[in-house]
């Protein structure tokens, strides 16, 4: 059956969101005394959205037999765009009325508030993880074209290799925000689609070539952790083959996790939406406890950066996010997907 539930991909989603939470936790700690540790953790966790896009492409193709563009967009409007808009409200108020968001364009705060809000929503810059939504929306809009490739011209999947090399050269960030990110992540999304399309062959191929794929992964990790010159962009070198390896590894060994990651995987989109709020909340609390002052957007890394504090911080954020979503689901029932994305 084409849309048979893929437990290993479900577990992969739980692994991916855990790494994403870890990636956004790193900057909340002060790594002055442990820079190499920070670089290694950063290489492991940062840009794990690559895994999310691979999974999204895989599931898009896997479920494509029942694809209807209108109902597809309606569902994405309800479960992705609506919670994005609702959950953006606190951050939009904070970063247009009270605190200037770091990393914005020099001219940004000279613009009227309505334009600031529009630019925040178009780019996702108001909360670190939320660039994902404007970017994935571009994939939703071109879904019929992607499906046409899969159904009528699957030989075009060979373009994944040169597009991957282009992404390695260009990197994720550029002047066009979500468009740059979409270009960067496009080969990974297509890789997920291709893996699903040629599932049996792909599983055999990856199992046979696991060693060279692992070597490429480790080279990419070394390049990022040791700060080799850029370009190339090493996290794309690392995580595209790593996505293939994890897919096949979890296919064989997802039973090790049993159902421990099932709920985290099930609410992963909701975690993506809200976890940055808890990172910030803990940061505000720790600045007040340690420095005795109110956090105003700068100097929030008052906790020493090491493996123990990193794991504790990330796990706390993950648990707070999961608990919040669980409560929201209990209180709002089926409406929770529109409110918190899960």
Show which residues each predicted segment covers.
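Aromatic-anchored segments of alpha-helical transmembrane domains
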Residues: 18-25, 160-173, 212-226, 271-277
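Transmembrane alpha-helical insertion/packing segments
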Residues: 3-32, 143, 149, 172-182, ...
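Interfacial loop-to-helix transition and helix-capping segments at the boundaries
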Residues: 37-49, 120-135, 171-188, 221-245, ...
């Amino acid at each position: 059956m084409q849309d048979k539930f893929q437990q290993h991909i479900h577990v992969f989603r739980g692994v991916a969101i855990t790494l994403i939470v870890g990636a956004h936790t790193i900057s909340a700690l002060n790594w002055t005394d442990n820079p190499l540790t920070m670089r290694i953790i950063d290489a492991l966790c940062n840009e794990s959205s690559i895994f999310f896009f691979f999974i999204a492409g895989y599931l898009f193709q896997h479920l494509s037999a029942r694809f209807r563009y209108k109902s597809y967009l309606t569902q994405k409007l309800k479960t992705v765009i609506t919670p994005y808009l609702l959950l953006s409200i606190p951050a939009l108020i904070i970063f247009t009325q009270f605190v200037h968001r770091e990393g914005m364009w020099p001219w940004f705060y000279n613009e009227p508030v309505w334009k600031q809000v529009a630019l925040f929503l178009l780019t996702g810059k108001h909360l670190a993880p939320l660039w994902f939504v404007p970017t994935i929306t571009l994939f939703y809009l071109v879904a019929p074209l992607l499906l046409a490739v899969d159904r009528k011209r699957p030989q075009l999947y060979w373009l994944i290799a040169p597009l991957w090399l282009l992404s390695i050269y260009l990197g994720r960030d550029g002047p066009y925000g979500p468009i740059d990110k979409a270009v960067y992540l496009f080969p990974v999304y297509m890789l997920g689609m291709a893996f699903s399309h040629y599932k049996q062959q792909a599983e055999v191929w990856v199992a046979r070539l696991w060693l060279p794929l692992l070597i490429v992964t480790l080279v990419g990790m070394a390049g990022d952790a040791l700060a080799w010159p850029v370009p190339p962009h090493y996290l794309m070198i690392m995580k595209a083959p790593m996505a293939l390896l994890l897919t096949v590894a979890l296919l064989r060994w997802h039973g090790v996790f049993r159902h421990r990651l099932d709920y985290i995987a099930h609410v992963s989109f909701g975690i993506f939406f809200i976890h940055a709020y808890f990172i910030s909340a803990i940061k505000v609390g720790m600045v007040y406890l340690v420095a005795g002052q109110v956090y105003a957007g700068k100097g929030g890394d008052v906790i020493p950066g090491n493996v123990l504090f990193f794991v504790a911080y990330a796990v706390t954020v993950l648990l707070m996010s999961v608990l919040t979503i669980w409560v929201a689901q209990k209180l709002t029932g089926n409406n929770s997907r529109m409110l918190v994305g899960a």
